[in-house]
Amino acid sequence: MNNLPKELPIFPLSNFIIFPKTTVPLNIFEPRYIDMINYSMKSNKLIGMIQPKSSISNTVPELHEVGCLGKITSFRETEDGRFLIELKGLIRFVKIKEIKTENKYRMLEVDYKKFSQDLENVKEDLKFTDLELIFKDLKSLFEKKGFVINWKALEKQSLDETINALAMASPFSLEEKQMLLESKNLDIRKNKISQILSTYTYDIYDNTTVQ
């Protein structure tokens, strides 16, 4: 963990989270983030993903306290100058402070100690039977919102991969996704998903919005 960078270029993306041990594709087209990826590719291939807060009152939105360090594992430049990358989550971090920079992209000083377990290969004691009700409610919610998910493929993944993939792809709000990202471990995250789903229950089954 001592080898991890304490200062990170960051990609603030609303309603988007990435977890350790998950990989996501990203389409980079804004000039400032093209510059950020160029910088990262020439150094350690690492960037930080973090959500801006919902109450945006200016052009430089305030950031949430927790994000995730990601490593660029695949890179391709398109004919029109966009970057298509794949980013693998490594470890979550806590924001310490923003660093002043002349770059157009933002930089943070971060700390990883709170989430050091993200680097460990410890299998948490959960079974698919623990997820059956959550899985059923999530499937109903995804279908209602028009989300297409390959459920058969998910069932073949490990439990942490399944829970994290569903949390990332879910139609939950920015704040709900942030709450899942900040959950200390998989069991807490599973319970948080269950709590969030309970607020959608009437909307799913009775066509009555309770939010």
What are these regions (language model features)?
Residues 156-159, 182-186:
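Small/polar glycine-rich anion-binding or flexible loop at a beta-alpha turn
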Residues 167, 178-181:
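Amphipathic alpha-helical segments within well-ordered protein domains
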